[in-house]
Regions:
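Acidic, polar-rich low-complexity tracts and alpha-helical solenoid repeat scaffolds
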Residues: 1-181
Length: 181
C-alpha cells in the first residue's frame, strides 16, 4: 500500500514549491515518502539532505539512503551509508541491520576490503552475539580470513559455524591443506 505515502509526498512537494522552509525533518519525510513509493532517485536526493549530524534522524536517513543505493545498483555508496547508519546507536534494530549489511558489502566488494570486512564482521559478533544472523556472519568471516590468507583464523572461524554447507566444508579442506604447508 503506497496511497498514503503518495499523498504525503504530493503535499510536501507542494509545500516546497510554494516556498515553505524545508528543514532536515521535512527533507526526511519527503525522501522517505519517495522511498515508500519506489522513487529511489528522488528519495536519494532528499534523504541525503536529511543525513548529517549524529542523531536518530541521520541514522534513519542513512539507513534508507543505503537501501536506495542498493536498489539502484550503487553498492559502494550503499556500503558507506550503511557504515554511517551502523555507527549511530539510536535505533538498535537499524544499527544491527546496517552493521550486518556494511560487513556483507565489505566482503562482497572484495578488493582491499577483506581486512576491513574482518573488522566489521567481528564487531557485529561482539555487539550482537545472540542474533539469528551469527552463523551467516561467521561464514562471511571464515571466507574473508581465507581470502586474506589468514588460514589459522579462517580455520577457527569455520569451526564455529554450527552447520557448515558443502562450500564451507570444501574451504575447510583447502584451509587445512594450506595450514599444513
Amino acid at each position: 500500500y503506497t496511497g498514503g505515502w503518495r499523498e504525503a509526498r504530493q503535499y510536501l512537494e507542494r509545500y516546497r514549491e510554494l516556498g515553505g522552509a524545508m528543514d532536515r525533518e521535512a527533507y526526511y519525510m519527503l525522501g522517505f515518502s519517495a522511498y515508500m513509493v519506489g522513487d529511489y532517485r528522488d528519495a536519494e536526493r532528499n534523504l541525503a539532505r536529511a543525513a548529517g549530524p549524529d542523531d536518530k534522524l541521520s541514522q534513519n536517513a542513512s539507513y534508507h539512503l543505503a537501501d536506495c543505493y542498493l536498489r539502484m545498483g550503487r553498492r559502494q555508496q550503499a556500503m558507506q551509508a550503511f557504515a554511517m547508519a551502523s555507527s549511530e546507536g539510536y535505533d538498535e534494530a537499524i544499527g544491527e541491520d546496517a552493521l550486518f549489511n556494511y560487513g556483507k558489502l565489505q566482503y562482497e566488494l572484495g578488493g582491499g576490503y577483506f581486512n576491513e570486512a574482518i573488522n566489521v564482521l567481528n564487531r557485529y559478533l561482539l555487539r550482537y552475539p545472540q542474533s539469528g544472523r551469527v552463523p551467516q556472519v561467521k561464514e562471511y568471516l571464515a571466507a574473508a580470513y581465507y581470502n586474506s590468507r589468514n588460514y589459522d583464523a579462517a580455520y577457527r572461524a569455520i569451526m564455529q559455524v554450527p552447520h557448515p554447507d558443502n562450500d564451507l566444508k570444501a574451504a575447510l579442506q583447502k584451509i587445512t591443506y594450506f595450514r599444513g604447508l
